[in-house]
Structure formats: C-alpha cells, structure tokens
Amino acid sequence: MKIAVLSRNPRLYSTRRLVEAGTQRGHEMVVIDTLRAYMNIASHKPQIHYRGKPLEGFDAVIPRIGASVTFYGCAVLRQFEMMGVYPLNESVAIARSRDKLRSLQLLSRRGIGLPITGFAHSPDDIPDLIQMVNGAPLVIKVLEGTQGIGVVLCETPQAAESVIEAFMGLKQNIMVQEYIKEAGGADIRCFVVGDKVIASMKRQAKPGEFRSNLHRGGVASLIKITPEERITAIRAAKVMGLSVAGVDILRSNHGPLVMEVNSSPGLEGIEVTTGKNVAGMIIEHLEKNGGPNQTRTKGKG
C-alpha cells in the first residue's frame, strides 16, 4: 500500500516508528507536512498538492495532527477522504475528540463513567458552581489545554474561586471537575486499536505533582487492567468514532472514570514501557481495514 503520514515533524518518535513499521511490512510510506499541503477544493476532481505536485495513488492516510493545527489538519484529512483515501482516524472523529466538552457530553450520554464536571464561561454564582462538583478539592481546566497545560488543582473553595475569577478575566471557557483523590495522582493510558486494547500503562505523577502526563515528568509503568477498564476504554473510543485512540482512565471508588480520549496518542511512552510493537499493530490494522473508498463518512462531516 502507499500510505501518507500527516505529521509536522518526520523526526518525532511516533512518526519515525510508523514509517519504520510500514516500510518493514513492504508499504511505501510518505511523510507529509500537514501545514504545507494545499488543496483544490472546488474541482470535480478533489486534489491535494504538496511541493508543487498533486498527491496521487494513496491507499491510506495516518493523521498525526497536533492540537494546535487541528482545524487545518482536519481540512487536509477531509480532502484525502474526498479523494477516497482510507483514513486511520476520520476527520469528523478527530475534530469531535479535540472538543473536550463535546467529548464528555457524548460519553456521558452513552453512560460511560466520568468525573463530575461543570462547564462555565463567566458564572454569576461561583460558590454554586463549586458546590455542583461536590466542593474542593477540585480541578479546573482550560478547554484548549494539552499535555497538562492549563490544569489547576484547587485545595480549598477560596483557591477555586480565585482561579475561576482569574480565568474569567482572561475570557476563557473552563471545566471544573471533582478531584479523584483515591487515584493518587495516577492514571491509566489504554491504547485502543480497532476493538481491542492492545497495550496499557500506568502513569504516576512525580511527587508533589497531580498531573501524570509524561511531558510533566510523570513515570510510566506496566499495569494489568481490569475487564471493566478494558470495556470502558473500547466503548469510549467507539463513541468518539476513533479506530486508534489513547483512552485515559482514573481508578475511582465507583469504577473506571474516563478523563480524555486522545485521537493522536504518542507511541514512545507506550512502546518503551510495554515493549510492544504498537506501530506495527497500527499498520496491521490498516492492512485489514484500509483500501480505497473505505471511509465511512466519505468526507461528509
């Protein structure tokens, strides 16, 4: 197969591994800088140009679209879909998963366990918002943040009020969530491919920190997940419409709670921790399911 990898940086671990795994399995892998591709939208024959030439003959596309380029990245991916190229994850699903609020609303509607969550812009009754999520300690998140940036743990109602007021002053939409103390600063990243969790790891925040992101100095280790956690991760990915996803779960006293569903999960942490060839399994999934004109939405979304 001829497979495009949409990525800003061919040197990133995840991009390198996908190219390696695809090449080893006999595919032609082409890395395309998402922002440098440009499109002919209104022709009877949809096209994407790159470095002065049309991109042609692709069977599948692997989107590795960073959060900051979601809008343009999804537009390029949608154009590939219009051209009948099979996407590993569809543009509609990626856009959906990048909207944290919409994601939680969809997961909640399907009865998937979530932390109690409030959403606000400039609430006229801050104490009531704080009470809504069972009071302090609580976590406040900026809607657009990634890698643990824009996430604050407030230990007291006073601290929570100050932080909410500060974000209001910045005209930010915020999420206010109950703090799951029993998780002990750890979460579980379940790596879903198709309808299986193919690998999972525990991420433990460094001492004195509550954010377990590896970018924040969190430490990854092997973990055996429960059947309930496995089912939750697979269902969460399915609700979002993602074939490949990193589902972040907290262990709480009332079962697994989904924190986030990531449409472009990094491979380095999970491969190094588990020793599994995750990139190879992703390519294998493409071989089984990919092929021209196999996209469900046909670029409609």
UniProtKB/Swiss-Prot annotation:
GO terms for biological process: protein modification process; SOS response; translation. Binds 2 magnesium or manganese ions per subunit. Residues 104-287 form the ATP-grasp domain. Mn(2+) 1 binds at residues 248, 260. Its cofactor is Mg(2+); Mn(2+). GO terms for cellular component: cytoplasm. Its EC number is 6.3.2.-. ATP binds at residues 141, 178-179, 187, 211-213. One of its GO terms (molecular function) is ribosomal S6-glutamic acid ligase activity. Mg(2+) 2 binds at residues 260, 262. Mg(2+) 1 binds at residues 248, 260. Mn(2+) 2 binds at residues 260, 262. InterPro entries: ATP-grasp (IPR011761), ATP-grasp_RimK-type (IPR013651), ATP_grasp_subdomain_1 (IPR013815), RimK (IPR023533), Rimk_N (IPR041107), Rp_bS6_RimK/Lys_biosynth_LsyX (IPR004666). It is an enzyme of class 6 (ligase). It holds the Pfam family RimK. Keywords: ATP-binding, Ligase, Magnesium, Manganese, Metal-binding, Nucleotide-binding, Protein biosynthesis. Coiled coil: none annotated. PANTHER family: RIBOSOMAL PROTEIN BS6--L-GLUTAMATE LIGASE, RIBOSOMAL PROTEIN S6 MODIFICATION PROTEIN. NCBIfam families: PRK10446.1, rimK_fam. Belongs to the RimK family. HAMAP family: RimK. This is Probable alpha-L-glutamate ligase. It comes from Pseudomonas putida (strain ATCC 47054 / DSM 6125 / CFBP 8728 / NCIMB 11950 / KT2440).
